[in-house]
């Protein structure tokens, strides 16, 4: 288990390195106009197609982290949990969020721009889109993700990016 956690932490650190570097300096204020938010491919712990921008912090280290995730149409983040709480704010599009061990589209909450969700640590949850969405996630690092069903973990899929 500890080897898996260490490997996950190392993988997260490497995956975020390209995106996190401008946000790592925390000794001054950060102002990022919308046209300067730079998205890149999300790390392999998310299904292919997602993009990420690290606005503040280092997701692989302790401390405050602010991420933006861009999901394409018909995107699903399968049921999973984190050891830290997540605070989601919808920037654009509609993100559907639900709790549980299976994706229940009828039981999901539709969050439009300005919508907010608080997901406590270890809460089993999932998210999906119909037409795409951009969501901001605030959390206390280090970031981790544990899929309920191992077969849903994109890091274990053949041909993982």
Predicted regions located by residue number:
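A short, N-terminal "cap"/entry segment at the start of jelly-roll beta-barrel domains
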Residues: 23-65, 109, 152-161
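N-terminal secretory signal peptides that target proteins for export/translocation
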Residues: 1-5
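Glycine- and acidic-residue-biased ligand/ion/polar-headgroup-sensing regions
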Residues: 72-75, 81-102
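Bacterial N-terminal signal peptides
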Residues: 9-20
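His-enriched metal-coordination microenvironments in redox/metal-binding proteins
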Residues: 46, 59-64, 78-89
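Short beta-strand His + acidic residue motifs that chelate non-heme Fe in jelly-roll/DSBH
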Residues: 77-79, 97-98, 119, 124-130
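Double-stranded beta-helix
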Residues: 30-32, 106, 126-161
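Short acidic-glycine-tyrosine-enriched beta hairpin
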Residues: 58-60, 95, 101-122
């Amino acid at each position: 288990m500890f080897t898996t956690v260490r490997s996950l932490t190392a993988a997260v650190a490497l995956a975020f390195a390209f995106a996190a570097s401008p946000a790592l300096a925390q000794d001054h204020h950060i102002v990022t106009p919308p046209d300067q938010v730079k998205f890149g491919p999300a790390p392999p712990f998310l299904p292919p197609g997602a993009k990420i921008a690290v606005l503040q912090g280092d997701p692989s280290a302790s401390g405050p982290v602010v991420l933006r995730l861009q999901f394409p149409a018909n995107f699903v983040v399968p049921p999973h949990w984190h050891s830290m709480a997540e605070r989601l704010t919808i920037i654009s599009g509609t993100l559907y969020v639900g709790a549980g061990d299976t994706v229940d589209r009828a039981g999901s909450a539709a969050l439009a721009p300005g919508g907010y969700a608080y997901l406590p640590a270890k809460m089993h949850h999932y998210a999906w889109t119909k037409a795409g969405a951009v969501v901001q996630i605030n959390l206390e690092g280090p970031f981790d993700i544990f899929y309920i069903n191992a077969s849903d973990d994109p890091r274990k899929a053949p041909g993982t990016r």
